[in-house]
Amino acid sequence: MTNREEIERRRTFAIISHPDAGKTTLTEKLLLYGGAINQAGSVKGKQSAKHAVSDWMDIEKQRGISVTSSVLQFNYAGKCVNILDTPGHQDFSEDTYRTLMAADSAVMVIDAAKGVEAQTIKLFKVCTLRHIPIFTFINKMDREARDPFELMENIEEILGIKTYPMNWPIGCGKEFKGVFDRNTRKVLAFSSDGRANGVKKVDETEAELGDPALDELLTPYLHQQLVDEIELLDGVAEEFDLDKVLRGELSPVFFGSALTNFGVEPFLENFLRLTPTPLARVDSLTGETVDPCRDEFSAFIFKIQAYMNKAHRDRIAFMRICSGKFERGMEAFHVQEGKNIKLATGTQLMAQDRAIVDEAYAGDIIGLFDPGIFSIGDTLCTGKKKVQFAGIPTFSPEHFARIEQKDTMKRKQFVKGMEQIAQEGAIQIFREVGGGMEEVVVGVVGVLQLEVLEYRLNTEYNVEIRMQQLPFEQLRWVQNDPDTYNLRDLDLTSDTKAVEDMKGNRLLLFTSDWAVRWAETHNETLKLSEFGNI
């Protein structure tokens, strides 16, 4: 198979949702149908020892939530599928933002009983900024659900995107019997003995809409209701336009139940048919697009994770390949460091499990062993003409705490742990301007990240900490030249604090919006930004 053929069979997408909409369960079932696992785990975890394959950190298994992005790969119907399973919990949204930079499309999972929720709105906005296709999977149809027409209207009104139902549900709750495929015009009736509890593939029966046998399969009432709803749907629904889908203007909608597997395989088949091959990325130096099928290799680092497996006390840099081919042992130019480095070993990751990768192509996500040379947003490339992809923005934290270790004899472990976790982008570390690590201020997007920080320092670095919450709510990066602009000359409120990050960038911490406005109105030449570059 040629490089172009390998690249064109890649499909790389992220799954996003509000917490508890069933995102990780859907990921598990896609792996089940893709043959990557023989039996699906269960994020419920109360009746058995199973946990979701994509939840690899102990705290994820204990809490039943995803706090880091997982990368999962499988082959299905000739396609090589890369899934980026992202944290649903709002406190870990920054990791999700970074992960969406590596995706070519997104699957938005919505709870059929609740419709669009707050976190879904935030993540949807990030997808629209990147103009990537957004597919919708309306989940939990096996429970009591809102009317399907109402759910479609809910998506369009709140998110401002047109929808097109690719299939239509037959009943809901205990009466959820299957879906009608609008492309093939066939009814797919699902059956399960109920004992497998969704851990194995579900049986399907295919029939024409007018087939009298559907009265027995569905009940006469559900059969007639389906006929009436399809007639109404065909009369009012917008025409399907793949170009609009690829521009992120029209969202194909699928109904199903990830827990029972109803509708999962039809979704997977249609999604892989419609979702794009690896997208061209923009070279920030020239503004030109980088063709994924070109011979020269290029990639960027979008995530760093330490201590992924207790058997491997190492750091892995997650790399999205944008063009060309990766080969184990190849040399690539590290743009930010300005030197060639050897990519000795690439790994394919299935949660905490890993396998050596000899070759990979544009669209693939692989892990690189990181001895401390990579940062989030770094570009790697080969060829005479160097490329550089845009840096990944870092978001302003909303919660701050002063951190110190309880045992002063463990200072070395404390500093190492804090720096490594910060390099992953999980936290941001600030210190007094010109100071060291004596007094460390940590900034996070959500308070649960502070709990995870304390847990990881204790379990991974054997360090216990004291934590004092601080009253700051806002952070701004100072854009003025540090050589000519002295922060001590600024007119600020008494509770505003000047700090610097680990790269020496200067920042101001504020306790309120009012304090931010004071700084902006009383210092005409002061330039502040809500975003910095990692």
Role assignments for model-derived ranges:
Residues 1-534:
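Structural and coupling elements of P-loop NTPases
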